């Protein structure tokens, strides 16, 4: 077998950088513009070019003192010095709208919008409010600002005149009949006190008349309620003998409401006539009333009957005149009181009826629905106007408004009831929280608006708004999680920049991720023709943390010059509210799911909070023709500059192309080595346009066998790693560098030497270009080893292997392994008869009953044989590594020892020689050699028997003992005195038991075993007839030849070295048999044989196979004794006993000894 080598082979491997590594937004050199954090400076940002300068506009909607957060917009110069501060625009100080009062807490700057190509912009204050009666309505307003940063009007498309926008002229009878005048003054003061007097609400004028009318004060004379009350208090009666009411009404309707007297053309006109008598010019009354009708004047008539009642006159004619003066119906516009004092009683009723009137408006039906619309909360520029979100319209259900050329268009309240059911109108869906639009193929445009609180999950609708206010919803998108604020931010994206929308991004910044973290999520929808919006996937921060990812989003031009637009997503709560900005690259089919860059505020040189709360990236602000990105933070605005993108094409060429295994051409560190030179080259290209320095520096470092233990190669004058070097590159050119290295160790020629170069652009001194995403950051060259194999560079070898074992054994005549021999020798010879054999190896496999003790070369040889043990019964040996050269021959001796634990019937040794060189099939048969022999083992066993009864005497009848004879035990013992683990042994016991006629003389009563299994077989039949008891006197032995024997066969368990096993046989002697028999002495012979199972690898010696147990039985005769001898013996015994008793008596043995108390008692009795 050969591993193919080609001398000119190169194997370059390129390693790419990760997707989340920093890309071409320069986060290390940001442009920071600080501002007041308490003003929420950074809430909104807008890139702006106007007046020949580049600015970054920053909204500070909470700017101003506490209680008057008017808000403002700061302009931060970008083209000038880096430390130039931001200038406050003071836009909040201007009078916005037609209000005469300065707005407070309007929060100007919450949204900023670039206007069409005039260098101006629009700043919105959604909380701009105006008072209407006792209510305050936040309709919102947007200020138009020109290129010189001066307000040029405002937009308040939902701001409407208050219902109390009225001009009220009081025509007061001051003739002599009015009495008392103080009651009239009180009536005037109380009536004025109920009116909301303000230049934007109610103005009051007064005409007093008697004989002639007089303008006491005109409509525009007083601006506050206090001024009018003061004038009413100081009003004097004109007096007069006549009451010319018609003339006064004519003057009031023709002069009092005129602009010269402070009248407002758009205000509602109310005339209040107070008189106590019928007019003296009644014939002129129809003309006066006609003039009032022409001037759209609504008339209240108040008849004071005090003069008539005091003189007891009929007031009918007077009341008819006053009813004629009052507008219809009389129930609403006519009053009569009994006297002057009673005027104060109708003040409340009159005030209520006045406030029941509304101003004159063209769109009266929607005035109250848009009062809290908060225009400017969200804005979107269209080609033909501006799209506003009206988040507070329709009781906070929300809506949108399209302003086109001064014409406003918005859907009526019920136009969206299919999407936003009226039953849920109190849930505050906040439609208009975000607005945008998308352009489909074919030129069709759809408006987009988010309602993040709809059903608490959020909703986005794509719709068309027609000229008549009708709405056609093309598709709606629903949020998936309660409280996620789905739809709070919308970002349509034209990825391929063909003018049509390809992707819609919908943010849910409060989406709860794992571990209840407020991670946020952005949903990516593909825009299609068949299915309008199809969910492609989601974007979210990793790992999960509190982020509010998607709080701000901004479409970006093609930052990475790949032809597709990109998008930025803010996450202001990341890293403990420091914030982060994510950059995603667009593709032909959408948006890449992983961020190309994450810019964390924590990694910036300035401490920031809530970085990423707003973002805008459309223009080049620093003048390098590259798009920059503006990002808002708490109290700061940051400008991130784009950096040029270059693409590096590295190459690495090595000379010579391969490393010689045998030849060395130089000396390094005092050793022979192979020297090589590598040419490292870089070709630089770039698609980045603009004015930037096309020359830059790069740092690189090189290493040899970086991940390999042990140094095979090193750089000249250095080690395995080369110190970092700096190289100057230029776009459009190829720059090269020479690297010199050498190889000392060629033994591991299979693995090429790996030369690895890693590189990166050097931007330590100034911001420079970045590498394209497709550019490598390292290159590796694998330099192979070459072989000395002739002109064809192909080594053809012929390995010949011969083996010889010093034992022989066949199946019929196996070799017996006896105790004196424990080893077997195998002589091995390996020879190479052709070309070099590289990486020659010898595989050795041997049977489990062998242990390799040693491998010894037979003669001194320069060829090394080194072996490793992949397993207990295999070896893998390298021979002459790395090259087993032509004609080489090596002989060595393998010494094996027989295993004591594994006993097999055969030993074998198999050897196989191989190399990486090529060997023809015709010579492969001698690459393998095997030798084997059949064997048996002679174990060292000791087989013995011992008995507890060796001789037994049989007593005749009439003597003791009587009954059966004794029970005795014969113990058989097998001891393993060798090293082998022996198994499969069998003990066969032949126990003589039965004589002629089935008479038992011995019988087996019990078998006691330990580590053995025994069975008792049938009685054996002797070669001849069993011996008869009467004939025992003619034989002296009982054995298996003349008796029937009991046979016990025991299979012994495994017997380890130094252990033993025993079998106990309990037998009973039958006295009855031997008492009847005629004999003097005989021997019972029990025979025991130790054998092996069939097919066993054991071979037992004769000495260890047999054992005997002998029992000698002897019959005794009775001895007769004379009767006189017995009688004499008894009498002699009795005489001897009497003599013994007499002697003891004489010695006092039988005398009773008294105790001391008894002696004393006897002495006393005697006395």
Curated annotation (Swiss-Prot):
The keyword Ribonucleoprotein does not apply. GO terms for molecular function: collagen binding; collagen binding involved in cell-matrix adhesion; integrin binding; metal ion binding. Ca(2+) 1 binds at residues 494, 496, 498, 502. One of its GO terms (cellular component) is external side of plasma membrane. FG-GAP repeats lie at residues 24-85, 95-154, 361-412, 417-470, 472-534, 535-593, 597-657. GO terms for biological process: cell adhesion mediated by integrin; cell-cell adhesion; cell-matrix adhesion; integrin-mediated signaling pathway. The chain crosses the membrane at residues 1123-1145. Ca(2+) 3 binds at residues 620, 622, 624, 628. Glycans are attached at residues 98, 234, 336, 364, 733, 763, 839, 921, 1011, 1018, 1039. Residues 1-22 form the signal peptide. Widely expressed with highest expression in muscle and heart. Found in articular cartilage. It comes from the Eukaryota. Residues 1146-1167 are cytoplasmic. Its main location: membrane. Keywords: Calcium, Cell adhesion, Disulfide bond, Glycoprotein, Integrin, Magnesium, Membrane, Metal-binding, Receptor, Repeat, Signal, Transmembrane, Transmembrane helix. It is a single-pass type I membrane protein. The keyword Transmembrane helix applies. Heterodimer of an alpha and a beta subunit. Alpha-10 associates with beta-1. PANTHER family: INTEGRIN ALPHA, INTEGRIN ALPHA-10. Integrin alpha-10/beta-1 is a receptor for collagen. The integrin I-domain (insert) is a VWFA domain. Integrins with I-domains do not undergo protease cleavage. This is Integrin alpha-10. It comes from Homo sapiens. The gene is ITGA10.
């Amino acid at each position: 077998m050969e591993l193919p080598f080609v001398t000119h082979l190169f194997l370059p491997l390129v390693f790419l950088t990760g997707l989340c590594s920093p890309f071409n937004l320069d986060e290390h050199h940001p442009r920071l513009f600080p501002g007041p954090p308490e003003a929420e400076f950074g809430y909104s940002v807008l890139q702006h070019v106007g007046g020949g300068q580049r600015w970054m506009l920053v909204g500070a909607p909470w700017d101003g003192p506490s209680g008057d957060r008017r808000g403002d917009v700061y302009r931060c110069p970008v083209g000038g010095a880096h430390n130039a501060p931001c200038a406050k625009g003071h836009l909040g100080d201007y009078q916005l709208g037609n209000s005469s009062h300065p707005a407070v807490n309007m929060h100007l700057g919450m949204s900023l919008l670039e206007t069409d190509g005039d260098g101006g912009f629009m700043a919105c204050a959604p909380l701009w409010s105006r008072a209407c009666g006792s209510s305050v309505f936040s309709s919102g307003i947007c200020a138009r600002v020109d290129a010189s940063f001066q307000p040029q009007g405002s937009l308040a498309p939902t701001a409407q005149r208050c219902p109390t926008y009225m001009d009220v002229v009081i025509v007061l009878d001051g003739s002599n009949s009015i009495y008392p005048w103080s009651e009239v003054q009180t009536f005037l003061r109380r009536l004025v006190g109920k009116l909301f007097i303000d230049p934007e609400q109610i103005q009051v004028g007064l005409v007093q008349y008697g004989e002639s009318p007089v303008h006491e004060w005109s409509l525009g004379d007083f601006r506050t309620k206090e001024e009018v009350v003061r004038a009413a208090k100081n009003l004097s009666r004109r007096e007069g003998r006549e009451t010319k009411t018609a003339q006064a009404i004519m003057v009031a309707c023709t002069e009092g409401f005129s602009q010269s007297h402070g009248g407002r053309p758009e205000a509602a006109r109310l005339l209040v006539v107070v008189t106590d008598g019928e007019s003296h010019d009644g014939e002129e009354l129809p003309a006066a009333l006609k003039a009032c009708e022409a001037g759209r004047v609504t008339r209240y008539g108040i008849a004071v009957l005090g003069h008539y009642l005091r003189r007891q006159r009929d007031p009918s004619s007077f009341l008819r005149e006053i009813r004629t003066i009052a507008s219809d119906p009389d129930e609403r516009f006519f009053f009569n009181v009994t006297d002057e004092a009673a005027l104060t009683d109708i003040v409340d009723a009159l005030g209520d009826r006045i406030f029941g009137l509304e101003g004159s408006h063209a769109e009266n039906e929607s005035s109250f629905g848009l009062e809290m619309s908060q225009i400017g909360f969200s804005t979107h520029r269209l080609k033909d106007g501006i799209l506003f979100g009206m988040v507070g319209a329709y009781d906070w259900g929300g809506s949108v408004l399209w302003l086109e050329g001064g014409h406003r268009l918005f859907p009526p309240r019920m136009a969206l009831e299919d999407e936003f059911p009226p039953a849920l109108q109190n849930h505050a869906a906040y439609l208009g929280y975000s607005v945008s639009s998308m352009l489909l193929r074919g030129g069709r445009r759809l408006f987009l608006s988010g309602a993040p609180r709809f059903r608490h999950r959020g909703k986005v609708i794509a719709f068309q708004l027609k000229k008549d206010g009708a709405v056609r919803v093309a598709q709606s998108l629903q949020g998936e999680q309660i409280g996620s604020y789905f739809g709070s931010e919308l970002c349509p994206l034209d990825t391929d920049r063909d003018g049509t929308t390809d992707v819609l991004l919908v943010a849910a910044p409060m989406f709860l991720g794992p571990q209840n973290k407020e991670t946020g999520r952005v949903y990516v929808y593909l825009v299609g023709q068949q299915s309008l919006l199809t969910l492609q996937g989601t974007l979210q921060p990793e790992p999960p943390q509190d982020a509010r990812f998607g709080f701000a989003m901004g479409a970006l031009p093609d930052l990475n010059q790949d032809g597709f637009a990109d998008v930025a997503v803010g996450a202001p709560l990341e890293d403990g509210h420091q914030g982060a900005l994510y950059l995603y690259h667009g593709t032909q089919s959408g948006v890449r799911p992983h961020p190309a860059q994450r810019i964390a505020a924590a990694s910036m040189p300035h401490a920031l909070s809530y970085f990423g709360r707003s973002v805008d990236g459309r223009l080049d602000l620093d003048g390098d023709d590259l798009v920059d990105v503006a990002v808002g933070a708490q109290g700061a605005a940051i400008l991130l500059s784009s950096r040029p993108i270059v693409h590096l094409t590295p190459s690495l060429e090595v000379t010579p192309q391969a490393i010689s295994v045998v030849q060395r051409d130089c000396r390094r560190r005092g050793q022979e080595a192979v020297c090589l030179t590598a040419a490292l080259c870089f070709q630089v290209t770039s698609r980045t346009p603009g004015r930037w320095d096309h020359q830059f520096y790069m740092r690189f470092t090189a290493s040899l066998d970086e991940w390999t233990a042990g140094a095979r190669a090193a750089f000249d004058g250095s080690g395995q790693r080369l110190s970092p070097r700096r190289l100057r590159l230029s776009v459009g050119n190829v720059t090269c560098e020479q690297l010199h290295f050498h190889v000392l160790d060629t033994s591991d020629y299979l693995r090429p030497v790996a030369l690895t170069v890693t590189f990166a652009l050097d931007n330590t001194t100034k911001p420079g270009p970045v590498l394209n995403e497709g550019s490598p950051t390292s290159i590796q060259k694998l330099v192979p080893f070459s072989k000395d194999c002739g002109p064809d560079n192909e080594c053809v070898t012929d390995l010949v292997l011969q083996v010889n074992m010093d034992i022989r054994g066949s199946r019929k005549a196996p070799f017996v392994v006896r105790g004196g021999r424990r080893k077997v020798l195998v002589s091995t010879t390996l020879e190479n008869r052709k070309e070099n054999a590289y990486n020659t190896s010898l595989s050795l496999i041997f049977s489990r009953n062998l242990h390799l003790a040693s491998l010894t070369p037979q003669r001194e040889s320069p060829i090394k044989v080194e072996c490793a043990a992949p397993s207990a019964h295999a070896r893998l040996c390298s021979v002459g590594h790395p090259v087993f050269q032509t004609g080489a021959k090596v002989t060595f001796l393998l010494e094996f020892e027989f295993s004591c634990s594994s006993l097999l019937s055969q030993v074998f040794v198999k050897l196989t020689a191989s190399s990486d060189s090529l060997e023809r099939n015709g010579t492969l048969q001698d690459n393998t050699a095997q030798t084997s022999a059949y064997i048996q083992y002679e174990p060292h066993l000791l087989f013995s028997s011992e008995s507890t009864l060796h001789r037994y005497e049989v007593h005749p009848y009439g003597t003791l003992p009587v009954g059966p004879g004794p029970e005795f035990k014969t113990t058989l013992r097998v001891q393993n005195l060798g090293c082998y683990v022996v198994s499969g042994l069998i003990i066969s016991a032949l126990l003589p038991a039965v004589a002629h006629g089935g008479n038992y003389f011995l019988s087996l009563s019990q078998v006691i075993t330990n580590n053995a299994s025994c069975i008792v077989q049938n009685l054996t039949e002797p070669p001849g007839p069993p011996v008869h008891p009467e004939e025992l006197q003619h034989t002296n032995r009982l054995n298996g030849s003349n008796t029937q024997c009991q046979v016990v066969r025991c299979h012994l368990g495994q017997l380890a070295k130094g252990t033993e096993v025993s079998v106990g046989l309990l037998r009973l002697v039958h006295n009855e048999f031997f008492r009847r028999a005629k004999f003097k002495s005989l021997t019972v012979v029990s025979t025991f044989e130790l054998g092996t199972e069939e097919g066993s690898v054991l071979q037992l010696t004769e000495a260890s196979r047999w054992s005997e147990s002998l029992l000698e039985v002897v019959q005794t005769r009775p001895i007769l004794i004379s009767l006189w001898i017995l009688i004499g013996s008894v009498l002699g015994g009795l005489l001897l006993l009497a003599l013994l008793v007499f002697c003891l008596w004489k010695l006092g043995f039988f005398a009773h000894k008294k105790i001391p108390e008894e002696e004393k008692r006897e002495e006393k009795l005697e006395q």
